[in-house]
Amino acid sequence: MSRSSKKGAFVEASLYKKVLDMNAQQKKKIIKTWSRRSTIFPDFVGHTFAVHNGKKFINVYVTEDMIGHKLGEFSPTRTFKGHSSNR
C-alpha cells in the first residue's frame, strides 16, 4: 500500500534543514546522509548527497528528473557479479 496523499511526502527533518541552510548561503557542499527513505524535493536539485548503501557512501547528484523519487533508489545496495558461463 502506498502512503496516504494527505500526509504528503516524507523527508528527514535534519536533512531538509541542511539543504535549506545551504540554499540560503548559496553553498554546494556534499551532504552526507544515511536517510535512504527521504523523498527528493525540488529544493534538492543541484546538490550532491553522499547516500549510505550499507557499506560506503555513494555520491548522488540530484537533477530535476529525480524529483519525487527516494534517495536510496540511486544508491544500489547489492553488486551483481554476473551469471557463471560454465554450461
Swiss-Prot record:
GO molecular function: rRNA binding; structural constituent of ribosome
Protein name according to UniProt: Small ribosomal subunit protein uS19
Keyword Cytoplasm carried by entry: no
GO biological process: ribosomal small subunit assembly; translation
InterPro entries: Ribosomal_uS19, Ribosomal_uS19_bac-type, Ribosomal_uS19_CS, Ribosomal_uS19_SF
NCBIfam families noted in UniProt: rpsS_bact
Keyword entries, A-Z: Ribonucleoprotein, Ribosomal protein, RNA-binding, rRNA-binding
Keyword set includes Ribonucleoprotein: yes
